[in-house]
Amino acid sequence: MSDAIHAPAGDATPPAFEALNRWADRIFVVSLARATERRERLRGRLGGLRYELFDAVDKRDLDRERLARDGAYDESRTRAPYRHRQDMSLGAIGCALSHRKLYEDMVASGWDRMVVLEDDVIPRASTLPLLPEALRELPPSWELCYLGYWQNEDISPGRRLKQLTYAAIAPLGLSRWRPGEALRLLPRGFSPHLRRAGRHMCTHAYAVSREGARKLAALQTPVAYAADQLLTMAILQGRIEAYAAYPALFDQESMEHSAAHSATIGTEVGGE
């Protein structure tokens, strides 16, 4: 667990939050309506940030068979590399629906820049001051930017060697990754505080442009991917122009749950 800012709402707003308030058209925190304790913790962690709570789709209100019958959910063509498990849990489906609804709302409302957080997000005190610089470095054509993520923040030589191996054998059909995907697995340098995004997990903190939201909503209709796997698929297949803040600016309460799916909506808010 990383360091965190715990600033009561009445205290001075951190400069990074002031910058984010000015930059984003909307800042949403995805959270179950019944997650009252998490919502209360946000008041201290995000003091000064002008965010709106977005009621997540609750797994208790979902029926897998009905969703499939209605054409709202279909992961029959989702490849194994973009699955956390054989079939998405109801919680993961609820998480995916929640994020997709935000994308749809963004497009319909005409917002240019939206920040999406989840209710277990933790600002990383040591790096958060770099947020204004990272935002300034985004090119006009950006569509997605991770502000926080799990996996591939620091790249070991062994991991780079593994990527080269995947890239070499992918054309032979010997890898789970296709050639273009293998080349995009690891983040690449871009600017002092940004990298071109690679394969990252979690959706606890990211920004999206209107065009990025339009693309993500279309790719997730019907729901076929966990929320974070949707972003991964779009990035590795070159469908979206994505960046990642480096170092990451936000963490989660429980990073150990990240490999399964987004900790907030995919486990406590939704896991089966």
At which residue positions do the language-model features occur?
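An acidic/histidine-cluster motif and surrounding catalytic segment
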Residues: 2-117, 121-272
